Amino acid sequence: MKFTKMHGCGNDYIYVDGAREIIPAERKSEVVKFLSDRHFGIGGDGVIFINPSDVADFEMEMYNMDGSRSEMCGNGIRCVGKYVYDHGLTRKTSLSIVSCGKIKYLELSVEDGRVTKVRVNMGSPVLEAADIPMDISALKDYKAVYKDILSNAKHTGLSKVAVKALSEVTNAVVAEKIEVNGGIYEITGVSMGNPHGIVYLDKDIDIKKFAIEQIGPHFESHMAFPERVNTEFIQVVDKNNLNMRVWERGSGETLACGTGACASLVATVLNGMCDTTATLHL
């Protein structure tokens, strides 16, 4: 099998041309788990097959390290853009990529015949709990905190974009209580094509020493998330800077997560803790 190993900000995947390397559907999960193993395989956060498509320029068929399917990966789709251009599969610099029925649009920057940058329109965040999906009955006494945030928006200076977004949902999960492994946390739910739960850490915690490997799996499999969840642990430095660590469903801790970065900024804006433009430090 021919493959290409690529990463975006350390979020590494194994990329395979699905039109040339034909793997039976029933064997893909097994093959992905073998290839992703960092000791006995190639090693990566998962495998991405790049396939032909009737509705977009290409299809991204993404799998997590554990062999499960995933809907979207911000870093992964950027690498797909570079792959298809650098491998001569297209000469277009404006691309459409479909994954699980959802189309994203890419803009490629090319220098000396090679892609140097890829910009992706990740689309609008999904805040409706049922569509993330989240089961609000599994939270600890859901209080629709977002309604209080809306009613106090004029006094707190909540951004207009946050006010508009929260005004359009029936049940949003913003700063709601959740019990995980005996502890009580505040969580905000966002989907960027895949489900995310954003949790905030105190400023006095050393985020680099935070035991994400112990608590991450408990969030991932919590009953509030019927399709499991990617969990971002965020530390607000100031209104323009956030520290982030991420536990991805099916892959564990990863060095970066593009959809997670987007979801974290959205959540932090909704909570009134940062501006609509900020830098996330991984």
Locations of the language-model features?
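A glycine-rich beta-to-alpha transition motif near the start of alpha/beta enzyme domains, typified by
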Residues: 1-114, 197-282
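ATP-dependent small-molecule kinase catalytic core of the GHMP/sugar-kinase superfamily
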Residues: 99-200
